[in-house]
């Protein structure tokens, strides 16, 4: 009887010890897993990927250079996509509060919709603030002086542009969003049309690249030109062909030249074949952008 009780007590004690060890081991395993996931670096969380836009864009070339010049980015990959696809990836990550790193620029509606920040760029790869500039074909001043006057005097602010971009992003047709802005900002528009005579159905072609900022500006300028009697055709092209179209006379002008960085190569190639009318927007910026909740403030933190 004594042996039987002793045996049962031993079995019970062994069972309790095994259960305790198993529970501790399971707890430690889960804890380690959580700790590992929680301590993943930003680089690991985004799988060493930067979400880019169209290949060939100035910001893509700058980012490729950043991957070369920043030692901590040696194992990173720049993912080519489009401005629309980049914005879609940003929105999906932001809604889940997941980290993401994108090639970004302002003005852009994403800064109005999301809490974002630029990563500091100690090496100055992305340069200082950019301007968006207007270019026209040679001879436009003589052929279509009223259009030339409007394009020469067109100038607005990042806030102006953002208002149009946000309306478009929220579902408005670009032409309708532009028409609304023109109607609501008649004083500013009158400054652009000052000295421009009305015309009777003359045709004019404006080239633009399919970035949200340029969709906004090109549609606004198009509406202003329509207001003084022009029949306006907007031609969507990639950045290089946009400059080429103006240089070759296939387009009369464009308000989409980002300088001195983004479109520098195209200006080098076509600059002597087009006429520059100066900045139509100041304070534009490009760089690597992350949601504000991402625990990194500099490219060197990645």
Regions found by a protein language model. Name each.
Residues 49-53, 57-62, 145-191, 297-301:
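Ligand-binding clefts/hinges and TM-proximal coupling segments of bilobed small-molecule sensing domains
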Residues 107, 216-299:
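Short, glycine-/small- and polar/acidic-enriched structural segments
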Residues 97, 110-123, 264-277:
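Ligand-binding "clamshell"
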Residues 16-20:
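C-terminal motif of bacterial Sec signal peptides marking the signal peptidase cleavage site
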Residues 22-25:
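Bacterial signal peptide processing site
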Residues 40-71, 77-87, 175, 201-228, ...:
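Bilobed "Venus flytrap"/periplasmic-binding protein-like clamshell domains
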């Amino acid at each position: 009887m004594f042996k039987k009780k002793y045996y049962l007590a031993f079995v019970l004690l062994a069972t309790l010890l095994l259960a305790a060890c198993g529970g501790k081991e399971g707890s430690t395993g889960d804890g380690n897993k959580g700790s590992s996931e929680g301590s993943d670096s930003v680089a690991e969380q985004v799988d060493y990927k930067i979400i880019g836009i169209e290949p060939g864009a100035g910001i893509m070339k700058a980012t490729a250079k950043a991957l070369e010049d920043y030692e901590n980015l040696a194992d990173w990959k720049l993912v080519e996509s489009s401005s629309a696809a980049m914005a879609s990836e940003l929105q999906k990550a932001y809604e889940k509060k997941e980290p993401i790193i994108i090639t970004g620029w302002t003005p852009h509606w994403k800064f109005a919709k999301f809490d974002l920040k630029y990563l500091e760029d100690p090496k100055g790869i992305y340069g200082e603030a950019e301007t968006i500039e207007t270019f026209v074909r040679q001879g436009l001043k003589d052929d279509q002086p009223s259009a030339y006057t409007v394009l020469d005097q067109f100038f607005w602010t990042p806030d102006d542009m953002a208002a149009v971009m946000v309306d478009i992003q929220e579902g408005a047709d670009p032409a309708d969003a532009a028409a609304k802005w023109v109607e609501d900002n008649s004083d500013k528009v009158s400054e652009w049309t000052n000295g421009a005579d009305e015309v009777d159905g003359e045709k004019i072609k404006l080239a633009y690249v399919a970035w949200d900022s340029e969709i906004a500006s090109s549609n606004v300028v198009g509406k202003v030109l329509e207001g003084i009697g022009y029949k306006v055709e907007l031609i969507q092209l990639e950045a290089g062909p946009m400059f080429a179209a103006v240089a070759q006379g296939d387009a009369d002008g464009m308000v989409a030249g980002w300088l001195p960085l983004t479109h520098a190569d195209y200006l080098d190639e076509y600059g002597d074949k087009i006429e520059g009318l100066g900045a139509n927007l100041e304070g534009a910026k490009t760089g690597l952008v992350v949601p504000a909740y991402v625990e990194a403030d500099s490219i060197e933190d990645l």
